[in-house]
């Protein structure tokens, strides 16, 4: 049963670093009323959501006004952003929003992170980039 006291937002770049994004979102839904993405690239968010079968309640650009609007739209007791940067993002208001670095949140929740050096998707992308460079 979802908690009605929390909204969780993931930066797209952060959730992409998890080994099983769908499982992470499903688990986050156990704790939160609303779960969504913050990203500047709507197309990438749509592709990511489709490929990983992720249902999101919202998707916004990373601006202070958008994040403040989320707080007004989802009137939960807590609003949490999980991101990849060590420092709190500039767009995140100091009040009413908590910030957790993905590595810390993953450790606390038991989520596995991708090994970016050996991920099959990363290996394929790297190989494909080399192929295209050799053709030019």
Predicted features and spans:
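Asp-based, Mg2+/Mn2+-dependent phosphohydrolase catalytic module
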Residues: 1-32, 68-78, 85-136
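Structural recognition of the conserved hydrophobic beta-strand(s) that form the central parallel beta-sheet
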Residues: 34-39
């Amino acid at each position: 049963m979802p908690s009605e006291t929390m909204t969780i937002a993931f930066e797209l770049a952060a959730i992409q670093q998890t080994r099983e994004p769908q499982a992470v979102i499903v688990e986050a839904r156990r704790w939160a009323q609303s779960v969504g993405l913050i990203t500047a690239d709507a197309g990438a968010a749509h592709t990511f959501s489709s490929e990983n079968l992720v249902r999101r309640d919202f998707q916004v650009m990373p601006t202070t006004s958008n994040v403040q609007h989320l707080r007004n739209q989802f009137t939960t007791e807590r609003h949490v952003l999980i991101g990849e940067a060590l420092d709190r993002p500039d767009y995140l208001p100091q009040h009413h929003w908590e910030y957790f670095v993905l590595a810390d949140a993953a450790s606390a929740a038991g989520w596995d992170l991708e090994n970016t050096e050996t991920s099959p998707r990363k290996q394929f992308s790297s190989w494909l980039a080399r192929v295209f460079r050799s053709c030019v």
